[in-house]
């Protein structure tokens, strides 16, 4: 794991350089907003001590070096896909979304092994530190306005819960991001439903459902916790009622797999009366996976059907399809190129 990259260790580095609590807060506030570390400490009453000012170049280099851009790829929809290198030369992906959003990674690889996702093919390599997670947001904010952070990149946030929640707390306080605009995505894990309500910052919840059929879900998400869809909805709904914002149910559309009328009918019944929104997401092609996306016409029909049944549904155009913006695709291509160059 990257040395000295947790938020606690970064705080220690600031203190060791001479930062007092007020300076530490101001410097972290500047960093998480994509600004120079001393951006909020230039007035006379907040001026940094001399020793800390002298340490600024080294500190700035350390913070900026947590993630560095290896390559960037802009899509026709104005999505910007970034391949990032960590200090141990592992690579992850972040996606700057059109408008004011960023999708960040929480792990190098993933242990869930979703059959329609590239990231899980190599398994889990390591956890990202809380500092590395926040660094992706800081990097994004240095490039564009960011008002929404979704934890839907590489990795399963529930499997790196402490670091993700530490990052969320900083983003929701010094980062000045609304709680509802911090979106915690998970395949469903009981620890999530226990821990999220306890935090001072309570993010919105996105639940990767993908099907209402337990057996099919076990096939599509082979290492996700075995929790019945109905129980997942009940757990998510309890959290949504407490936070006053809806659960987002993610549903990757796979032709002939989870786009049938039987799925739609069961889904409409399952979510009736619940505080929820369904996000239909057309499948992003993955090499070697025998899946296809349904036609846009069919996907739109599914959305309209749920509307008629009283369930809010949205049809999302997969961001950056022309720049391999599906989780892990850009990283996998980079690995193939690197391997061929070594051969």
Annotated model-derived regions:
Residues 111, 189-191, 214, 320-324:
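Alpha-helix N-cap/helix-start and coil->helix boundary motif
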Residues 96-97, 163:
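Residue-level structural signal for beta-strand termini and adjacent loop
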Residues 135:
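Cys/His-clustered metal-coordination modules, chiefly Zn-binding fingers
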Residues 140-309, 314:
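Conserved AdoMet/S-adenosylmethionine-binding subsite of the radical SAM
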Residues 97-131, 139:
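Canonical Radical SAM [4Fe-4S] cluster-binding loop centered on the CxxxCxxC motif
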Residues 1-89, 237-245, 253-343:
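Auxiliary Fe-S-binding modules of radical SAM enzymes
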Residues 91-93:
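Short, mixed charged/polar active-site loops
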């Amino acid at each position: 794991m990257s040395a000295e990259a947790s938020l606690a260790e970064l705080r220690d580095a600031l203190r060791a350089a001479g930062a007092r609590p007020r300076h530490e807060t101001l410097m972290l506030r500047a960093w998480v907003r994509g600004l120079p570390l001393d951006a909020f400490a230039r007035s006379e009453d907040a001026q940094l001590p001399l020793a800390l000012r002298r340490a600024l170049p080294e500190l700035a280099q350390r913070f900026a070096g947590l993630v560095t851009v290896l390559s960037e790829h802009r899509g026709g929809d104005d999505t910007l896909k970034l391949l990032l290198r960590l200090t141990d030369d592992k690579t992850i992906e972040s996606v700057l979304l059109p408008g004011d959003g960023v999708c960040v990674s929480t792990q190098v690889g993933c242990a869930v092994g979703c059959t329609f996702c590239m990231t899980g093919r190599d398994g889990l390599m390591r956890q990202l530190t809380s500092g590395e997670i926040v660094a992706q947001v800081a990097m994004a904010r240095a490039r564009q306005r960011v008002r929404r952070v979704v934890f839907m990149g590489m990795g399963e946030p529930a499997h790196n819960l402490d670091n993700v929640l530490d990052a969320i707390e900083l983003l929701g306080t010094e980062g000045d991001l609304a709680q509802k605009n911090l979106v915690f995505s998970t395949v469903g894990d009981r620890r999530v439903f226990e821990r999220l309500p306890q935090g001072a910052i309570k993010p919105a919840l996105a639940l990767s459902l993908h099907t209402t059929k337990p057996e099919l879900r076990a096939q599509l998400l082979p290492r996700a916790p075995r929790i019945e869809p109905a129980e997942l909805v009940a757990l998510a709904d309890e959290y949504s009622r407490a936070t006053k914002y809806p659960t987002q149910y993610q549903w990757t559309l796979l032709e002939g797999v989870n786009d049938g009328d039987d799925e739609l009918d069961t889904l409409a019944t399952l979510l009736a009366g619940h505080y929820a929104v369904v996000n239909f997401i057309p499948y992003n092609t993955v090499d070697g996976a025998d899946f296809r996306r349904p036609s846009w016409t069919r996907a739109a029909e599914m959305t309209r059907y749920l509307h008629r049944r009283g369930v809010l549904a949205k049809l999302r155009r997969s961001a950056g399809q022309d720049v391999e913006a599906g989780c892990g695709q850009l990283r996998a291509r980079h690995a193939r190129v690197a391997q061929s160059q070594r051969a």
